[in-house]
Curated annotation (Swiss-Prot):
Family (UniProt): Belongs to the isocitrate and isopropylmalate dehydrogenases family.
One GO cellular component term noted in the UniProt record for this chain: cytoplasm
PANTHER family with a match to the protein in the record: D-MALATE DEHYDROGENASE [DECARBOXYLATING]
Organism: Agrobacterium vitis
Superkingdom of origin: Bacteria
Example of a GO MF term: NAD binding
Name used for this protein in its record: Probable tartrate dehydrogenase/decarboxylase TtuC
Induction description: By tartrate.
Main localization category: cytoplasm
Pathway(s) served: Carbohydrate acid metabolism; tartrate degradation; 2-hydroxy-3-oxosuccinate from L-tartrate: step 1/1; Carbohydrate acid metabolism; tartrate degradation; 2-hydroxy-3-oxosuccinate from meso-tartrate: step 1/1; Carbohydrate acid metabolism; tartrate degradation; D-glycerate from L-tartrate: step 1/1
Gene encoding the protein: ttuC
Cofactor remark from the record: Binds 1 Mg(2+) or Mn(2+) ion per subunit.
Location within or outside the cell: Cytoplasm
Keyword Oxidoreductase: yes
Amino-acid positions noted as binding Mn(2+) in the UniProt annotation, renumbered to this chain: D222, D246, D250
Length: 364
């Protein structure tokens, strides 16, 4: 019996709802597979913890997480706590503290979900966006001076290192090489940002020589938004900076139907530390407690987690179950359905178990 230790951090808003659904699905997979076991410990860190203790997580938070094989994260952010506090107090310290430098965000149109793009079906939009996750625009360097005065100044410094850019570029090329189309698009803004972005272009060309079987091109980030919208079938694997990929991956999720189906993995490729898996969507306080949060993104990122742990069969079984459920029309309101979180979760669990309840659920 293979055993794994998972740290669950539901955090804010709908985070607890979707993480609970994700853990239920993982339990169904355990029962179906019978050859692995997941042991979960839940941490109550987040905005409520901040209101009580003045910090989003304790000072020894990273030390507590080191013993786990992976981290299952919900969402962070609260209306009454500044966003920079919630982000820099919890999610980013984990990503940067554990050197999870590869943020991997797959996107595709799932069966049964109608995307906003005309004449675009499941086979036309199937991407993986690789986001540099350790430096760049989110390096945390900068400052403010003369606060409150007319001459107040704020600086936000983007830092790009040869080591950081090279390793994410190599990761992206390897990923593109492993995918059927072997296509990679490198995204920068090197016409206007003439230092770090030009270095990105140069390093991309250098790393490309190691992967002669990968066809690659480069795009300016503004032009990339147009290409993603008008010519989605021309793209496959995409690599971009921390900020650019953050924005592009949200666009990708929307083009595929909803951020509610968009997953992400924060990976330490060298496996020195636990990697973290989370849905892309935010805490969504507007629907918190209503029971209608879409759990599909959490299920998909659970599949990413299983694959990272080496449980590829279980990951494939989970995604097959998800696609059976969406194709049957069991969908939450954000993707045009009437089902709630519980109904989608139960349908996926039934699909994993091989139950025939799907048709009944779709007809209700």
């Amino acid at each position: 019996m293979r055993e794994y230790k998972i740290a669950a951090i539901p955090a804010d808003g709908i985070g607890p709802e979707v993480i609970a659904a994700g853990l239920q699905v993982l339990e169904a997979l355990e029962q179906r597979s019978g050859d692995f076991k997941i042991h979960t410990e839940t941490f109550d860190w987040g905005s409520d913890y901040y209101k009580k203790h003045g910090v989003m997580m304790p000072a020894d938070g990273l030390d507590k997480l080191k013993k786990f094989d992976a981290i299952f994260f919900g969402a962070v952010g609260a209306p009454d706590v500044p966003d920079h506090i919630t982000l820099w107090g919890l999610r980013l310290p984990i990503c940067q503290g554990f050197d999870q430098y590869a943020n991997v965000r797959p996107t595709k149109i799932l069966p049964g979900i109608t995307p906003p793009l005309r004449n675009c079906g499941p086979g036309d939009l199937d991407w993986v966006i690789v986001r540099e996750n350790s430096e760049g625009e989110y390096s945390g360097h900068g400052g403010r001076a003369h606060r409150g005065l007319p001459e107040e100044v704020g600086t936000e410094v983007a830092i790009f290192t040869r080591v950081g850019v090279t390793r994410i570029m190599r990761y992206a090329f390897k990923l593109a090489q492993a995918r059927p189309r072997k296509l990679l698009t490198v995204v920068t803004k090197s016409n206007a940002q003439r230092h770090g972005m030009v270095m990105w272009d140069e390093i991309a060309a250098e790393v490309a020589t190691e992967f002669p079987d990968v066809t690659w091109d480069k795009m300016l980030v503004d032009a990339m938004t147009v290409r993603m919208t008008l010519k989605p079938e021309t793209l496959d694997t995409i690599v971009a900076t921390n900020l650019h990929a953050d924005i592009l991956s949200d666009l990708a999720g929307a083009l595929a139907g909803s951020l509610g189906v968009a997953p992400t993995a924060n990976i330490d490729p060298e496996r020195r530390f636990p990697s973290m898996f989370e849905p892309i969507h935010g805490s969504a306080f507007d629907i918190t407690g209503k029971g209608i949060a879409n759990p599909i993104a959490t299920f998909w990122t659970a599949a990413q987690m299983l694959e990272h742990l080496g449980e590829r069969d279980a990951a494939a079984r989970l995604m097959s179950a998800v696609e059976r459920v969406t194709e049957a029309g069991i969908l939450t309101p954000d993707v045009g359905g009437t089902a709630n979180t519980r109904q989608v979760t139960e349908a996926v669990c039934n699909a994993i178990a091989g139950s025939n309840i799907l048709k009944m659920a779709a007809a209700e």
